[in-house]
Amino acid sequence: MKKRFGILLMAAMLAVSAVFASGCESKPKEKIKIAALKGPTGMGLVKLMEDNSDLYEITLYDSPDQIVSKIVTGEIDGAAVPSNLAPILYTKTQKKIKLTNVTTTGVLYIVENGDTVKSIADLKGKTIYASGKGGTPEFALNYILKQNGLTPDVDVKIEWKADHATVSAAVASGEAQIGLLPEPFVTTTKAKVATLSVPIDMTQEWSKASGGSSELIMGAFVMTTNIIDTRKADVDAFLEKYKASVDYVNKNPKDAAALIAKHGILPSAAVAEAAIPRSNIVFTSAQDAKKSLEGFFTVLKDSDPASIGGTMPDENFYYTGK
């Protein structure tokens, strides 16, 4: 009798264990939390957003400042940010983030309400309306001007405005003749001004100015070391989906534009479709982009060490996939 009771008890325990094991196995993983900016920085994620809402919680923000504290406190697992913010976050988090990939190269352009500017040299004696003082737009503009023999605020006057929308409005109204604008603001301004020209691609000018030793890199993606260490396979799967999403956007601009408008990354599909070709949306792994990033960060550091957090990031800053 005792033997039979023992067998029944063991069977019951095994059944209970199986139920608990089954419950554990079926429990869904917590969504990976991602932050992105509206505009080109977030455009490459749109297909991933559309197809994988069950795996990723992706929130769009208007300003990088809204993202910084969330990364520092660990409230989010990853973020698409301006490139110079990545090493700043590396310092702020005490090296608890890694740069996984570059998301956008240059999206900056000189636009003119007219046709007097054909080259950087033609900017001498002119006034440029711009936004982004203290950030990559300022450092990029100053670097390119200096490399072409022009001294900012001496040979070329720069009027710094609060945001890109203000610069766009000034050019559209005729208040400003020349502006420094990123996509999609180039496209939206062009829609308002029939005579608007886009004579200078700052990405090309950066390459010329640096002798090809670095690249104008505007956006990067970072992830916390916590999510990398605890869910590396999921991180790698996310990055694969991210790369596929970028490929989709570049190869299917019309369909991607509809999704970009649907998810609120840009206000309209028409603007998105026109902006995609000039937005330089890419997925370049940290390993493949390392040399270009180091060259870019060196230029920023030489201009103002605070622009990258004071010091050049070390080797551990770059995610290798290992």
Language-model features, listed with the residues they occupy:
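Short, low-complexity disordered leader/linker segments with a strong preference
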Residues: 1-31
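Short, glycine-/small- and polar/acidic-enriched structural segments
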Residues: 27-153, 158-160, 177, 183, ...
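Solvent-exposed, polar/charged alpha-helical surfaces in well-ordered, non-transmembrane soluble domains
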Residues: 43-50, 65, 69, 73, ...
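A bilobed periplasmic-binding-protein/Venus flytrap-type ligand-binding module shared by bacterial periplasmic
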Residues: 47-48, 108-118, 215-233, 285
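Pocket-lining segment of extracytoplasmic ligand-binding domains
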Residues: 84-85, 165-259
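Short, surface-exposed acidic
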Residues: 152-156, 264-275, 307-314
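Secondary-structure end/capping motifs
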Residues: 228-303
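Conserved C-terminal helix/tail region of periplasmic/extracytoplasmic solute-binding proteins
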Residues: 294-322
